[in-house]
Every structure is written in C-alpha cells, then in structure tokens.
UniProtKB/Swiss-Prot annotation:
It is an enzyme of class 1 (oxidoreductase). Coiled coil: none annotated. Pfam families: Radical_SAM, SPASM. Gene3D superfamilies: Aldolase class I (3.20.20.70). One of its GO terms (molecular function) is S-adenosyl-L-methionine binding. [4Fe-4S] cluster binds at residues 18, 22, 25. One of its GO terms (biological process) is pyrroloquinoline quinone biosynthetic process. Its EC number is 1.21.98.4. This is PqqA peptide cyclase. It comes from Xanthomonas oryzae pv. oryzae (strain PXO99A). It catalyses: [PQQ precursor protein] + S-adenosyl-L-methionine = E-Y cross-linked-[PQQ precursor protein] + 5'-deoxyadenosine + L-methionine + H(+). Binds 1 [4Fe-4S] cluster. The cluster is coordinated with 3 cysteines and an exchangeable S-adenosyl-L-methionine. HAMAP family: PqqE (MF_00660). Keywords: 4Fe-4S, Iron, Iron-sulfur, Metal-binding, Oxidoreductase, PQQ biosynthesis, S-adenosyl-L-methionine.
Length: 372
C-alpha cells in the first residue's frame, strides 16, 4: 500500500440535473439519473473521509447543486469538519430561502456562471429563457448576505468580443473575482466544438482585453484567465497533476482524478459505496495510472517541464490522438500538434453550425420536479 500527499480539494458533483442546457457543458455524454445519485449519508461520509485525509476545500457542484434539498445539511457538515465550502451554481434554481439556509449552514463562497452579457446570447448558449436577469438577481442576493462572489464567464466564438462587458458586469454585481475562461472541449462541449471554436484573432483580442482590465483595475477585481488549448504551444497540467491535488466525486459516487476522466475507455473507477476514499486515492487503478512521471512516453521523460505540466491532459490526449497515454497533442513536441492547430483554424474559419443541445427542444425554464 502506498500513500500519496492528500488532495487539496474535493469536488462533489451532487447531481447531473440542471435547468440549463449549455452547449459547452463539460459533463459526460451519459448523465446520472436522479435514482442513481448518492444519498445524503453517502455524501456525509465522503466529507468525513476527505477531512480525515487532510483535504481543505469542498466544492459543491453539479449539474445544479441547489436542486439537492440536502445541500444545506451537507454544507453544514463540511463546516463542522473544518472544510472550506464553495458553491458552484447557475443561479437560476435557488432563491433567497435556499441561500439563507446555506448561509446559516456556513457557506463561505459562491461561484456563479454567466454565459454572456447579451441577454439573447446568454439564453441561446444556455438553452434557457431569461437567464441573465435571474442571475443578476441571484448575485444581488448573494452580495446582500455578505458572501464572497466569483463570476465564471465562459468564452467562445459567439461572445469573445464581449470580455470588457463581462468584466464590467462583475464589477456591477460586486464580485471579488472573475474567471474568464475559454471553452475547454470535454463531454458535451466536444460535440459543439465546431460551433464554439474562436479564431486566433478573437483569442488575441480576449488576451488584450484581460491585460487592459488588469492594468486599469488593479486590485479592484481579481481576474483569472484561461486560454483555449487548441491554440497553445504548451499543455496545461491536468488539475495540477493527475491524482495530485484534486479529486472529483460523480453523482453516483465514482471517484475520479478529473472531471472528464470517464471518457477514458477501459479505465476502472472505484466507487465510494465499495471502497474508502483514502484507499482509492492512494492505490486506485485510475489514480495510480497517470500519477507522477513514470508513465510518460520518451518525449515527455526528457522534457524539463515534465513536473510542471505533468504531460498535459490525459482526456484531451485521448480525444485528439486516440491514446490517453501519449503526449497531450497541444504540446508543440507532439507529432499531432500541427493537426490540432489546423483543426482549430479550420473550424473557426467555417460558418458556425447550430448548437446541439442535450434537450433538442431548447427547454423552457425548468423546475426541480422536471429534471429527473
């Protein structure tokens, strides 16, 4: 039995149910049904095991975590265990009563997704009507309660020019931080890649907009920026390194090294109903497979950045090359690098196809009762 340093944070994907139908959704193609979700006792046990391991942060996500009626109980349990609690939400499924319960339970931070500052654009990408006003009202409710707020703004070819407006919105909504992140093409988002891929010119404009805002705003607003991998020369480290800093729990209780790991066919993922979290983290097949550097191909082994980017993203290597154990094709040392860049340029230059939604009818506003 081996022992790895404990993860810094655990992401609890409480449910895959969600009012939105975002074209860039990174959740798996096959979603967990309501009847498959882990029960309250299972999630409480997970939090206890995480705290015992030395985990510091618990991020409550989904789907939409506010559709779980036991969310306040789980947040309170995390607080009692000394875990920092963060809510990652769409902001359209929970109102003041739920937020009051979460604040009373000890919630410490809220991350709110914003699809666009243009109302029509926001509704189109989210597949949900009147989404932006609902998010604005939710943000006001969060700030009225004194909770710290981060805005998560996802970029693509249809909204890349509106980065200045997104930053202005974060200031108007009194957020402390905004994450301006280009779409990462995993899960359902990969199906819509051709509809979402920005041009290189759009990318450079977003970089300039972020740099300008950082200079002008100083410490008034923290701005994080994530570029699209397809135009990069160096890969990003997968979650800070596969199986090193982060652990993801699916609604079914499967323990994953990263959000998209289930796309890797043939890899076995242990479940909390059958095995303890610490044992899975230290010895589970999925975590050991790509942890560290021993698994790396020769080109990675000789790279001075091998313990910086850790070989890049395993799920992306699979998606773009068909082999999860090879170099991330984003890396300029990869034989497939030129093909990745060509794919991005070709798709960005072509007319954007229509979005493919999980629910093809582009749903009307949903309720918890309709989201099984």
């Amino acid at each position: 039995m081996t022992t790895a340093p404990p993860p810094l944070s655990v992401l609890l994907e409480l449910t895959h149910r969600c009012p939105l139908a975002c074209a860039y959704c990174s959740n798996p193609i096959a979603l967990a049904a309501l009847r498959e979700e882990m029960d309250t006792a299972g999630w409480r046990s997970l939090l206890e095991q995480a705290a015992e391991m030395g985990v510091l942060q618990a991020h409550f996500s989904g789907g939409e975590p506010m559709l779980r009626k036991d969310l306040p109980e789980l947040v309170a349990h995390a607080r009692a265990l000394g875990l920092y609690s963060n809510l990652i939400t769409s902001g359209v499924a929970g109102g003041e009563p739920m937020l009051d319960q979460l604040q009373a339970a000890g919630l410490e931070h809220v991350q709110l997704s914003v699809q666009d500052v243009d109302p029509a654009g926001a509704d189109r990408i989210a597949g949900y009507r009147n989404s932006l006003p609902k998010k604005r009202d939710f943000a006001a409710t969060v700030r009225a309660r004194g909770l710290p707020l981060t805005i998560n703004a996802v970029l693509h070819r249809h909204n890349a020019e509106r980065v200045p407006g997104m930053i202005a919105l974060a200031l108007e909504w009194q957020a402390e931080r905004i994450e301006v992140a280009h779409t990462q093409y995993y899960g359902w988002g990969l199906r819509n890649r051709a509809a979402l891929m920005p041009s290189r010119e759009q990318l450079m404009a977003t970089i300039e907009a972020v740099d300008t805002a950082r200079r002008e705003l100083g410490d008034r607003l923290a701005i994080d920026f994530v570029t699209p991998d397809y135009y990069a020369r160096q890969p990003k480290p997968c979650m800070g390194g596969w199986g090193q800093r982060f652990v993801n729990i699916s609604p079914r209780g499967d323990v994953l090294p990263c959000h998209a790991a289930e796309t890797i066919e043939g890899m076995r993922f242990d479940n909390l109903r059958e095995r303890a979290l610490a044992d899975i983290w230290n010895n589970g097949e999925a975590f050991v497979r790509f942890r560290g550097t021993a698994w790396m191909p020769e080109l990675c082994q000789g790279c001075p950045k091998r313990e910086i980017d850790w070989g890049g993203c395993r799920c992306q290597a699979l998606a773009l090359s068909g082999n999860a154990a090879t170099l991330d094709p984003v890396c300029e040392r990869s034989p497939a690098h030129a093909q990745v860049r060509a794919t991005a340029e070709r798709e960005a230059a072509a007319p954007a196809p229509e979005f493919i939604y999980r629910r093809p009818e582009r749903p009307a506003p949903a309720t918890a009762d309709t989201l099984e």
